[in-house]
Amino acid sequence: MSQIKNTQQNSYQGKALWRSLDEFADTAEFRALVEKEFPNHAPELFHSTSRRHFLKVMGASVALAGGLAGCRWPQQQILPHTSRPEGRSPGVPVSYASCWEQQEVAEGVLVTSYDGRPIRVDGNGDHPSHRGSTTAQMQASVLGMYDPGRSSQPSHVTADGHATADWNLAISALRTAGRSGKVAVLAAPSSSMALSAMRNRLLREVADSSWHEWAPLHRDSERLGTAQLFGRPMRPVADLSAAQVLVCLDADPLMNHPASLQHSSDWAALRTSADDDEPILSRVWSVESTLSVTGGVADVRIPARTADIPRIAAQLAAATGVQLPSDVAAAVASAPPSTDDRIQQMAADLKSHQGSCLLMAGDRQPAEVHALVHAMNIALGAVGKTLSYAEVAHGERPAHIDDLQRLADRIGQGEVETLLLIGVNPVYDAPAIGKSWKDLIGQVPHSMHLGLYDDETAGVCQWHLNQTHFLEEWGDGRSWDGTVTLRQPLIAPLYSGRSALEVISAVVD
């Protein structure tokens, strides 16, 4: 049709069409209804409109929308370079090596950049810890940089409430705090050696300063278990590619573990097909209270309560000839032994594969179970073959809950003048230590929060400082096996934020 006409107009040949009886009758009530629904365009519904006029209006609106969207393209502030590098073609994606850190473990990644803007995060195929594997969390990490809910500027408390501030004023406040002393830092745990060096400098140069760490999800029981056995915390590094028999006591190494990517790759390499010339049929035993990924692929899965795992571990230790530590012996003395025949079969399987077996305990188990599991690994000859140990960062650090208690005691005794919180939200996810963390932070004369979001903790601090995303900053970290990985920025900070290194540097300068 070249024209859209009212059904009452008969100036053209053809059958008149209508959508309802009211439209066909063209009553005053129908016209009033249309006027109410389309007040500015009601006359157009009853008069002919040419296709040319319709396309003209639509073309103008499309051009206007395209013009408005194109207004931002020439802005170059967020590009990491002022001029295009030689040999770089616009529109061709480029990948850069960097690292992404989660739960105090850095993973090597390849970040794809499109015309100076990072758009994708994948595993680095040249990194030895996971050989290019990736997780959903790793790939989704790029979305945090473009999150419109990110904090975009510093703010501080005034007589009228929270007001925006600039970084010059914030840096001045940080330097004043460093000169005054009595600075306490509560930070998220990190494997960064650069941040560790800055931490040591803060403790050395700022009078009466202290450093504390907190994370709601941690592996403190594993650290304490190795400390009980070896005298200092160690990090167990498993090699599932050499484990003919794997026993998981409430552990999920294929999913719920910082090194799950490497574990999955190693385990899959050992489970070769029976059609191969020399098939390898490794065996997995899983004792757990909740179905996990590892339990789902296990050859034998034994359901058990989490509270029963120490008793089962003690039975395995007795069957393999390992002496129980006094703490574990006291914990399981009153518990009756399991009557499940598969526990004895598991112990026999371990003894028949000495040097090619491995036991792992989950992070929900107490430190005594971890110590017992490592003692069994040593007795069964796993160390040096299916298991090794690496040094951990800040081995002298106490457990997270004990560190919170130490900080709360310092605040209560008036030993903290400035509290700097970096990448943590204790008001939301930390347990109360006598008082809520909202009240504890309120007792400190000066409180400053550095984070990606203006969250619950930022709301009770006197200062909130917007933090850079990991794609906007320099840094470093260590993978689970101790491999050092460097971080490089893919883009200039979108909101002129600062990293933890820059903020601590301002305090000690």
PLM feature segments, named:
Residues 1-337, 344:
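N-terminal export/assembly segments and adjacent metallocofactor-ligating motifs
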Residues 165, 169, 177, 208, ...:
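Non-catalytic alpha/beta scaffold blocks inside enzyme catalytic domains
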